[in-house]
Every structure is written in C-alpha cells, then in structure tokens.
Amino acid sequence: MMRDPATRGVFGLPTTAAAGGRALRRVQLLVTAVALGGIAQAIAAEPREHLHLAVNLRGDYSGAASAGFNLADVSTQSALKALPEGMRGIYWLGNGYNLHCLWQLSDRQVTDTVMAVKDNPKFSGIYYISDEPHPALCPDAPQRLAERTALIHSLDPRGRTFVVVLNGSAAPTEFAQLKDAADYIGVDPYPCNVRNEVAGCNYAALRERIDQALRAGIPNTRVVPVFQTFGQACTSAGRNYSPYYRLPTLAETKTMLAIWDEKVPVKDRPFDMAYSWGRQPTVACPTLEMADGSAHPDLRSFYTDYFARMKGASPAR
C-alpha cells in the first residue's frame, strides 16, 4: 500500500521516508506510549462507583436511596422499572437448595427472565441465585448452583451471579464447597445477639467467619460483606423461636464496619449488602428502615456517612 509522505501521524507529526524518518517514528511511538501510559494512570486513579445493596425494601426505594444505597433486590420487571434514578436492581431469581433440594424457578423461567432484563439500563448485571444453600442437606447444591451460573453466563456473558453462604458452626465447609458455584459470595456473620448485649457483639466470631471465606480461596474481589442491620425484638408472636439477634448500637456498628474494611477493603469488594432494610414479620424487626434515631439508634445516618466516605477510595485494580 502506497502512503502519502505528507500523511500526518499521531499528534500531527509528519511521517516521511527520508533519512531520520525511522528515528522520528521511534520518537512518535515513545510519545504515544508515554501519553497512553498517562491516560491509563488517570483512568486507574478515577474513583469508581461503590455499590451498596439494600434488601427487603417493600417498595421503599427512595428511602433506601436517600440513605446512600444504590442497589436494590427486585424480582419483577415492574419493580425494576420503579427504581429511582441512580439505583439499579439485583435480580432475585428465587431460592434453591436451601430448605428444599430444588430450584424455585426452572431453567426455562430463568432463561426468559435473563433475556428480558439483561439489557435493561436499570439492571445491575447481577443475578441473586440462592440465599444460604446447604450442601449438607442437598449434596448436589454446589453442582446445581454452578450449572445455574453457567446457564446465566451463556445467556448474559457480562452478567454475574451472587449467592449468600452461611458457613455456620454446624456446616463449616460451605465456603469451600460453594466457592466456585457463583461469581460473588456473600458472607453474613451476624455477631450481635441478646446474649452479648452487655459484653458487646462477638467481633472475634465476625473476624473468624471472614477469615474462613478467605482461607477457602475466595478472594476479596469476590467477597460481598453482609452487614447486620436488624434485630428480632419486635418480630411477630407468630414466630416459632425466641428472639436471638439484636440491632447493633452505633458504636458496635462502627467496630463491625472497621473489621470489614480491614479484612475486605472497600477498594476490593464488588459491593456490600445490608440485611435488612425492611421488616420481615417473623425474622427481622427492628431493621435499618426503622433505625432513624427515634426509637432506635440512628444507623441510617451512620451508613449514609460511611457510604459517602467511600467515594474517595481508590478503585479496584
């Protein structure tokens, strides 16, 4: 191919076939490399949007958004459409392999859902596929979750799957068994309960649960911190248990978040999650929605400030 010797190269420098042209081109390449390197550094230095998930909103999207949450769990397209500006949905695909060893939604239903939402601008690209699956009860749970993740990836290559793993004392190998079953693994230790109301939350147990996930081979970039923002003092009389968990105080919340920040730094985590924003009559009450400083500690303002401070954090590499 013949080129005009007066053709302009990068940054307007002329390229010629005359003596010294090769040296000039080397200078051009060097200048280009330096410029691109500077651009790459500038992009890397730009703070990314940190993502915060609120669950059980019961339609209170604006309330959660005002507290700094920019992700909401949704299970219908109408809920996705109702999200306010700046908030995106994590799509709940129904539970599976938790209390029953099957999926609530069939592969066909999941396929239809993924195809319907994957390009929606209000969708985050994250699919919540199971909440606390138990391989001890359902030995094929790791395989079935991995298959569902593979199905979603085949339909939405940019999509990511999310599962919360308990890994409690009764089943301490769940992290190891489920670490490859989904893209993001939620870790949900709830260290504040009625037994330690005087002594304070069990921070050692919180640290140990996080360490268990990391030792199982789940990197920080896949760990989703699940913050305790609920108690059970006002759950309904219809429950079949005695209330155990209690809403953390402001001081306890500060300590818990400091531990999370140490173990799973803000710059690494894909997003974080608060359980729970809204009440669940037999499971969670009071919750973050209620913790506004009136009858309960003002955890809402505390989380608003915590999220605001993240905006200057460095992006994940």
Question: Language-model features: where?
Answer:
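Sec/Tat signal peptide C-region and signal peptidase I cleavage site
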Residues: 39-44
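Short, well-ordered helical secondary-structure segments
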Residues: 17-18, 26, 169, 174
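Bacterial N-terminal signal peptides
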Residues: 28-38
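Glycan-processing catalytic domains of CAZymes
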Residues: 45-317
